[in-house]
Amino acid sequence: MELQFLGTGAGQPAKQRNVSSLVLKLLDEINEVWMFDCGEGTQRQILETSIKPRKIQKIFITHLHGDHIFGLPGFLSSRAFQASEEQTDIEIFGPLGIKSFVQNSLAISGTRLPYKIHFHEFTDKDMGKIMETDKFLVYAEKLAHTIFCMGYRVVQKDLEGTLDAEALKKAGVPFGPLFGKIKNGQDIVLDDGRQILAKDYISEPKKGKVITILGDTRKTPASQRLALNADVLVHESTYGKGDDRIARNHGHSTNMQAAQIAKDANVKRLLLNHVSARFLSRDCRQMEKDAASLFENVKIVKDLEEVTI
């Protein structure tokens, strides 16, 4: 499971940072990639990665500001150009209005897609669990931005314990149907009368990962709820230390506010993105250092950077 950041800048493209987009790679888990936001130029950023557009089967939009959605029509169109590969449908989750934006953009440009788009639109009355599969849950809450904006909490369901095949072989259990019974938690009796207890050969269930990905937001209790005990929190850092007032006026957060949320929510790792273009490399190093005074395990991520979860 990995995060890869396609755009980590704020507002408009800059030389070092494109606008907002990131992907959650779940290739080992479910052979899918999930995208979060799709600012302009996202499809160009993908060309610099190993990501296959057809693997992107779910897109989660945080809000409808242009730097988070203007790349969506282009990405959906270029995804259709993979004629030699199997076409897969795509699901788009986001605020009310995302469906009309996408459909109007495609219609006006005369774009016809060889796959279906399934839209899931939400208002502030629809928050809570918004998606569930056999392996994952996704929750959403309203954040505190200048327009309706959502934050997402992706929860991997606990993983089943693994079967210790080598130990079973040593115990004289013949490979075959008996292995399956033990894996399903069923005790068995061998031909020689020995009882094999399933619990002795299956490891404890492994706790699933929790990844919280927030959109643009002021400091708000909703961020802390979404991030509670998360393995990774992706939080915006449009402004730096001492910029609390201007951040609040513009519906954004500072690096210090993000660090405080991470600390209060007991997250394991904080990744800061949505960085203003006015912050150069040396400024970002200082912002990271300042944030680390509140929450040690913090990093300001760069475009195309990958983080293993």
Swiss-Prot record:
Cofactor binding: number and manner: Binds 2 Zn(2+) ions.
Enzyme class (EC, first level): hydrolase
Cofactor list: Zn(2+)
GO molecular function annotation: 3'-tRNA processing endoribonuclease activity; zinc ion binding
Reactions catalysed: Endonucleolytic cleavage of RNA, removing extra 3' nucleotides from tRNA precursor, generating 3' termini of tRNAs. A 3'-hydroxy group is left at the tRNA terminus and a 5'-phosphoryl group is left at the trailer molecule
Residues at the active site: D67 (proton acceptor)
Catalytic activity, EC: 3.1.26.11
Binding residue positions for Zn(2+) 1: H63, H65, H145, D216
Keyword terms of this UniProt record: Endonuclease, Hydrolase, Metal-binding, Nuclease, tRNA processing, Zinc
Residues the entry annotates as binding Zn(2+) 2: D67, H68, D216, H274
PANTHER family: ZINC PHOSPHODIESTERASE ELAC PROTEIN 1
Family: Belongs to the RNase Z family.
Job of this protein: Zinc phosphodiesterase, which displays some tRNA 3'-processing endonuclease activity. Probably involved in tRNA maturation, by removing a 3'-trailer from precursor tRNA.
Subunit note: Homodimer.
Protein known as: Ribonuclease Z
Species in which this protein is naturally found: Streptococcus uberis (strain ATCC BAA-854 / 0140J)
